[in-house]
């Protein structure tokens, strides 16, 4: 995740990067990444005070996927601006929850996450109604794991720290 953000910022010159977790328990993950990356890498000079020749890091933003789908996903799909995103999703609900309604809800969350990644990549052509046309070819990374556990969360945090 971290190295991809460096690539997108420095070499593709994309100024922002979105983090979209499809798990309410990860609601603070985008804010954590903002604090980590933007405070550390949001400077215009290096440690010796020399002006940087390349951008240091992107603007990091995001929200839980279910909220994001109804607010800014249309912009991600249809805007003239391109913003890469990471879509984060556990494929199974938390252990110990045997309620079928919970399992069905979580399955729909995972399906939505995969569908968003697919739509960003492939688009949804609709030339008859241009306001509904999705071009596709929008950069996104779908990061999935089995269940959200402390171990899985640690791995996710480690992926975010690779370039720091």
Give the label of every model feature segment:
Residues 1-162:
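A SIS-like phosphosugar-recognition module
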């Amino acid at each position: 995740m971290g190295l991809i953000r460096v690539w997108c910022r420095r070499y593709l010159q994309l100024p922002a990067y979105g983090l979209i977790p499809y798990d309410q328990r990860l609601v603070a993950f985008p804010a954590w990444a903002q604090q980590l990356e933007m405070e550390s890498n949001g400077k215009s000079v290096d440690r010796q005070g020399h002006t940087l020749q390349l951008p240091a890091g992107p603007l990091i933003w995001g929200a839980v996927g279910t909220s994001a789908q109804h607010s800014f996903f249309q912009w991600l799909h249809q805007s003239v601006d391109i913003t890469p995103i990471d879509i984060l999703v556990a494929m199974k609900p938390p252990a110990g929850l045997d309620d079928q309604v919970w399992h069905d809800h979580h399955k729909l969350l995972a399906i939505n996450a995969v569908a968003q990644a697919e739509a960003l990549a492939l688009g949804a052509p609709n030339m008859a109604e241009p306001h509904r046309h999705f071009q596709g070819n929008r950069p996104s990374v779908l990061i999935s794991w089995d269940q959200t556990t402390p171990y899985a969360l640690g791995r996710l945090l480690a992926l975010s720290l690779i370039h720091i």
